[in-house]
């Protein structure tokens, strides 16, 4: 089964492109490290398949938290990213969530309705 990672980014924060790129990178790295530690086989499959990553946009914090609830209930690795607040957003602002890597079909049940960033 195809594995992928999905990162959902809040569009209500009006972050610049560079800021979004950094936040997505934080999510991808932390999810990958966590996956390596708790499910090495899934991580290795994802890595060997080319480390597929999809970035989608969500409206606000409520949608991020709903994604987290669903991922937790399905046992999917997920990581919330909170910004340090040095540049564009306040300290502690949740900017995005990373999911996976995991089976594409499982992640699509959670994030399939969101548009690509």
UniProtKB/Swiss-Prot annotation:
It is an enzyme of class 3 (hydrolase). It catalyses: an N-acyl-L-alpha-aminoacyl-tRNA + H2O = an N-acyl-L-amino acid + a tRNA + H(+). The keyword Kinase does not apply. InterPro entries: Pep_tRNA_hydro_II_dom_sf (IPR023476), Pept_tRNA_hydro_arch (IPR034759), PTH2 (IPR002833). Its main location: cytoplasm. The keyword Transmembrane helix does not apply. One of its GO terms (biological process) is translation. It is found in: Cytoplasm. Its EC number is 3.1.1.29. Keywords: Cytoplasm, Hydrolase. One of its GO terms (cellular component) is cytosol. One of its GO terms (molecular function) is peptidyl-tRNA hydrolase activity. The natural substrate for this enzyme may be peptidyl-tRNAs which drop off the ribosome during protein synthesis. HAMAP family: Pept_tRNA_hydro_arch (MF_00628). Belongs to the PTH2 family. This is Peptidyl-tRNA hydrolase. It comes from Thermoplasma acidophilum (strain ATCC 25905 / DSM 1728 / JCM 9062 / NBRC 15155 / AMRC-C165).
């Amino acid at each position: 089964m195809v594995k992928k990672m999905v990162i959902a980014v809040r569009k209500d924060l009006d972050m610049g492109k560079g800021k979004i790129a950094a936040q997505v990178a934080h999510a991808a790295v932390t999810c990958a490290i966590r996956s390596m530690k708790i499910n090495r086989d899934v991580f290795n499959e994802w890595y060997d398949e080319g480390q597929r990553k999809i970035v989608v946009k969500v409206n606000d914090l409520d949608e991020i938290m709903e994604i987290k609830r669903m991922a937790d209930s399905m046992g999917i690795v997920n990581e919330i990213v909170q910004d340090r607040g040095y540049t564009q957003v306040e300290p502690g602002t949740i900017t995005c969530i990373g999911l996976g890597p995991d089976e594409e079909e499982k992640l699509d049940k959670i994030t399939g309705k969101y548009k690509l960033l």
